[in-house]
Structure formats: C-alpha cells, structure tokens
Amino acid sequence: MARLPILLLLISLVYSTPSPQTSKKIGDDATLSCNRNNTTDYVVMSAWYKEPNSIILLAAKSDVLYFDNYTKDKISYDSPYDDLVTTITIKSLTARDAGTYVCAFFMTSTTNDTDKVDYEEYSTELIVNTDSESTIDIILSGSTHSPETSSEKPDYIDNSNCSSVFEIATPEPITDNEEDHTDVTYTSENINTVSTTSRESTTDETPEPITDKEEDHTVTDTVSYTTVSTSSGIVTTKSTTDDADLYDTYNDNDTVPPTTVGGSTTSISNYKTKDFVEIFGITALIILSAVAIFCITYYICNKRSRKYKTENKV
C-alpha cells in the first residue's frame, strides 16, 4: 500500500510523447491497446488515464479499480498475453470521450530485491468524428413516416370564391287600422296573419327559393316575412330557412341554427353568460332584501317583547 502514492506521483510527473491517432464516429466503440517493451521484468501494476489529469483505472492482475466516475459499463479492461498487452474498450462514444489516452506499466526486476520501479507509458489520441451526428439526424428524419390521412370529405365547402347575386322580393306591409292585438298562426304551407276584429285576412306567400349554382353545388336560401299590425305600428318579422347547412362555413357558439317544422322556421337562441349573471344578481338582491327585512322585523319584535316583559315585572 505504501507504493501506491509513489506510483500515482510518477504518473503525474511523466510527460507523454507524441501519440498515434484513432478516429471513430459518435456511437461507435473504440478499442485502445499498447504493448510494453520490457518483457523480462515483472509487472506490478498497469494504469490508464486521460490527459490532462483524469485517472481512468488501475489494474493489478485481475483486480481493476476505476476512478473519476468511470465504470466497467463505459470502459472495459483486458490484459491478455501475460501482461504484455493492456487494452481498454470505450463504449458508445460521445464528443466528451475525445482526447489523449495514456497507458502505463509499472515493473520491478525479477533478479534482485531492490525497490526500484521501472516505468513505461504509451499514448494514443482518440478523435471522435462529430460530423456523423448531423448525418444520423438527417437519415432519421428522412425515414420518418408521414401521418395517415383520411379521404373523407369535409363537413363544409368554402364557397367564399363563388360569386352570386341574391334578389329578395320584399312583400308589401299589411295595414290594419284596428287598434287590436293580432294572433299569428303558422301553417305547414304558408304564414297567415289574421286579425281578430278585422274582416280582412291576408296571406304572405313564401318567395321562391334562391339558388346559387356555382362550382356544381347549390345553396338555397328561403326567406319569409311575417307582418303584424299592432297599435304601436307595423312590425315585420324576417324568417330565414337555410336548407344547405352543409355549406355553413361559420360556427356561431351563441346561437343555434334555425329549426324547420312543417315548413315554418323558428329561430332558437341560447342564453349568454351575461344573461345568467344578470338573473343571478337580481335573485341575490331579492334574497338579501328579504333577509334584511326579516332581521329588522325580528329585532323590532324582540325589542318589544323584552320591553313588555320588563313592564310586567315592575
């Protein structure tokens, strides 16, 4: 054990000579080996380290000791031919593995009993070709499979490029001099406006469908008007039936598409968040007002009850 510090000191003091080069690619395994010239002396220990000052391993016969976070999974050691050759294999090369590796032999003479230690070292420069990394990336990116595509037709057809002219004939308003309410009845064929007191009855016929024939597709818009005469004036209601929902390119989250039942069109609207907030605020205000009235009433009644009990005791 006393020789180990001396041997480590010798390793740090010896300068390596120009070394041969070994070139490998990233991901490959590199095997580095060296042969000793003195074949007569006894090998006490062999060592591998990486310049400038990183000790990889120390080996004595079959015992191997790793340093500086090196493990046998990364670097394997072998010493065949009766310690004449020492070999290491660096697995899965990375750019950090490039550098100068030095192998060293520590030997003693077999003919005398002196403590003299002979030292031999040999260096090898390992070059890791980093250009292969980009080549691997290109190969991998070129072998990727494109995602599967579906041949189904879209739910809508964008007819923004289609040019069409719509002409809508607006029916004449119905004038009713009677200042009475009007009942509106819907039939499957048309929309009738009937006055409860007037003798005259008028029927608004639905205009002819409007057809847009562009790019082999048809868009039909049916527009009907309902005119109601009241005491405040004439109110005209417009109802639109779109029988080409397939070509609707805009989705409105606030409204529901018109629902057609028996030829009549009814537009159904969803409540917005603002409406619910207003309803909730009004309800909360009513509840708070009721609680306040209850508390005031309870306080007055309790005060009178206490006053009445006090007077009775007196």
From Swiss-Prot:
It is found in: Virion membrane; Host membrane. It is a single-pass type I membrane protein. GO terms for cellular component: host cell membrane; membrane; viral envelope; virion membrane. PROSITE patterns: IG_LIKE (PS50835). Residues 1-16 form the signal peptide. Glycosylated; contains phosphate and sulfate-substituted glycans. O-glycosylation is required for hemagglutination and hemadsorption activities of infected cell membranes. Belongs to the orthopoxvirus OPG185 family. This is Protein OPG185. It comes from Cowpox virus (strain GRI-90 / Grishak). The gene is OPG185.
